[in-house]
């Protein structure tokens, strides 16, 4: 049996595309060592400069490790964005494809030919997919592309306009995954709250939530990447009212200064953002995640200070911060740039604030009772079982370490009520109290 090595870089949306490719290549034996693989696939990220460099370095590194007569295949956003340049500058690569042909990867390998469709790939209920990284959780991609016009973002230039999957397609995929034992789902897209806008339906997510709740066997779900102008008050209230969708609110804000929100073409002012955030925060057991960019063209010292004060005071649970990356095909590319020195200085300042904010969020968990799902043996050692809070997304929000149990041996993928005993440098030590369900 031929062997396959696949490296998926970038976001969880890329991961879903990689899992689609694995589904098409199920005849191959997956291997952990690229030096033993007959086919090596790199699914690249082309979002910002650091991601582009990571993708190029990965390609060159894998070429160095590959065995003679193996195939090196490069796909994904970086290839779609820089197709002509990379095909000239990467003679190490055997086959190239972009973001439109994930379900034809088996065909291109068989025929040893490049493939570049004009449209972005959108999976259907018939798409074969091999879930990786968990036996109980899966990401569900509900749309591709984006209609927003953020000044800093090039994604619409290579992913295209919003294309939503039909609700029936998503429900069919969910039912199949539930039948295979999956019961925890994260719904993703470039802009999830614009779901079905392209089909003339506002608040399409509400209808999707209604349909998801009818499926027996789903224990928890969450929605990632809400966009401030497309996420309505009705949607937030529907999530809060749901018995399946947890009160996990992931909304990248990018800034809070009205001046910067206008320059960044975010479509909402700080008053609107704070109203939305306060509604989310009012939900029982709410968990708020966001992200900000520092050093975008036009950011004054006053804008930055306003952002820092807001991050310090609001009480987010998780915050990501990024240095502005100058990207071709964006409105910000031709604006007067903030110097690298100033950007790096601001990044260090806000990273310190963010670390303190996240530490407070972990600390307030001590003494709480939380529903958690066991994910396996912890990297901290054989005496700990790793788990995640049922509200959290997979991997990015933290780890719970269980070293005591009042309910016997713990089962992977099973849900338990735990008491949080201690915060150990952003990892929570916990005791399992009881098994919650037997599904």
From Swiss-Prot:
Catalysed reaction equations from the record: L-aspartate(89)-[ribosomal protein uS12]-hydrogen + (sulfur carrier)-SH + AH2 + 2 S-adenosyl-L-methionine = 3-methylsulfanyl-L-aspartate(89)-[ribosomal protein uS12]-hydrogen + (sulfur carrier)-H + 5'-deoxyadenosine + L-methionine + A + S-adenosyl-L-homocysteine + 2 H(+)
Cofactor binding remark: Binds 2 [4Fe-4S] clusters. One cluster is coordinated with 3 cysteines and an exchangeable S-adenosyl-L-methionine.
MTTase N-terminal domain span: 2-114
Binding site for [4Fe-4S] cluster 2: 146, 150, 153
CDD domains linked to this entry: Radical_SAM
GO cellular component: cytosol
Gene Ontology BP annotations: tRNA modification
Pfam families named in the record: Radical_SAM, UPF0004
EC number: 2.8.4.4
Any one GO MF annotation of this record: aspartic acid methylthiotransferase activity
Keyword set, alphabetical order: 4Fe-4S, Cytoplasm, Iron, Iron-sulfur, Metal-binding, S-adenosyl-L-methionine, Transferase
Domain of life: Bacteria
Gene3D superfamilies hit by this protein: Methylthiotransferase, N-terminal domain, tm_1862 like domain
Chief location of this protein within or outside the cell: cytoplasm
Cofactor(s), names only, from the UniProt record: [4Fe-4S] cluster
SUPFAM superfamilies on file: Radical SAM enzymes (SSF102114)
Ligand binding ([4Fe-4S] cluster 1): 11, 45, 77
Family from the record: Belongs to the methylthiotransferase family. RimO subfamily.
HAMAP family: MTTase_RimO (MF_01865)
Role noted for this protein: Catalyzes the methylthiolation of an aspartic acid residue of ribosomal protein uS12.
Protein name: Ribosomal protein uS12 methylthiotransferase RimO
Gene: rimO
